[in-house]
């Protein structure tokens, strides 16, 4: 059985460090604030946003909430974005996705002030990441990819020269994690697999590290991985469990793979807590840039 990479423990340590940094900021007259824009009442989104504000309270970051009804128009959402852009109490913020049908998510993201882009997903910030493959970056980084890399670092997993197979090309991680993995400081070699990739499983069998972000429960099987590989499970599927009569969250990696792996992230309890921690880290870093 491989080493279980505990995202909850690493996230807790990260938040403890951030709480100290927030105290130093307050001592110098800077109060960080995280804003959220929530449109509608999707249970998953409501729960996720509530978790973010609970994290804020834990480390001393102020919460700024903007809630709109399910039938909100594009202009109403855009107005909420502009309000947070102009609000000096808001250090950074996120627009909780998905937005209701009929609202262009990309157009809304484009309206976010890049300096307040807590998710690190604004085109300007992604462009900075593309341009600067070396040295420090003074713009927010995508939370989930950053969380993956910080989680592996916490377990002293060196990715230099490693073959990394990324499954899925979604913007949250699939298309963005390669930008971080191929930076000089990480130095991994990345293969991005998607629905058009021929013989995906052959790519998986060659990989030292698999980052699974497809949203297909149990897609990665033991026969698809080599002995001693590292498995990072970012996929989220809700699967009905007949025993409990409830839906449960399942990852992309079949748990039988853990026997062959050198290390693995459980799902839930692996990358998810780190994504939330990296959101806080982005906000604290934004505040520190004001010094």
Please place each PLM-identified region on the residue numbering:
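Short, well-structured alpha-helical segments in soluble
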Residues: 76-88
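Short beta-strand segments enriched in small/hydrophobic residues
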Residues: 31-40
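Positively charged, low-complexity intrinsically disordered leader regions
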Residues: 1-30
């Amino acid at each position: 059985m491989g080493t279980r990479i505990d995202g909850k423990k690493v996230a807790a340590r990260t938040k403890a460090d951030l709480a100290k940094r927030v105290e130093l900021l307050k001592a110098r007259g800077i109060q960080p604030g995280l804003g959220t824009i929530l449109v509608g009442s999707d249970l998953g989104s409501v729960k996720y946003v509530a978790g973010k504000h609970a994290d804020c309270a834990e480390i001393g970051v102020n919460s700024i909430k903007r809630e709109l009804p399910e039938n909100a128009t594009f202009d109403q959402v855009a107005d909420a974005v502009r309000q947070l852009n102009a609000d000096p109490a808001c250090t950074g913020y996120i627009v909780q996705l998905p937005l209701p049908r009929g609202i262009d998510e990309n157009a809304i993201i484009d309206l976010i002030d890049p300096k307040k882009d807590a998710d690190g997903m604004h085109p300007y910030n992604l462009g900075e990441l593309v341009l600067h493959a070396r040295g420090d970056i003074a713009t927010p980084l995508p939370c989930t990819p950053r969380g993956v890399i910080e989680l592996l670092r916490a377990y002293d997993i060196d990715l230099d020269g490693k073959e990394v197979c990324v499954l899925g090309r979604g913007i949250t991680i699939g298309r963005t994690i390669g930008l971080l993995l191929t930076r000089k400081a990480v130095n991994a070699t990345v293969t991005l697999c998607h629905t058009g990739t021929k013989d995906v499983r052959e790519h998986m069998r060659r990989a030292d590290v698999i980052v699974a972000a497809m949203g297909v429960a149990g897609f990665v099987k033991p026969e698809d991985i080599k002995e001693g590989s590292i498995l990072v499970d970012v996929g989220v599927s809700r699967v009905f469990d007949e025993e409990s009569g409830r839906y449960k969250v399942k990852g992309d990696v079949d748990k039988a793979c853990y026997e062959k792996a050198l290390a693995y992230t459980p799902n839930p309890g692996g990358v998810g807590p780190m994504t939330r921690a990296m959101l806080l880290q982005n906000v604290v870093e934004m505040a520190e840039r004001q010094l």
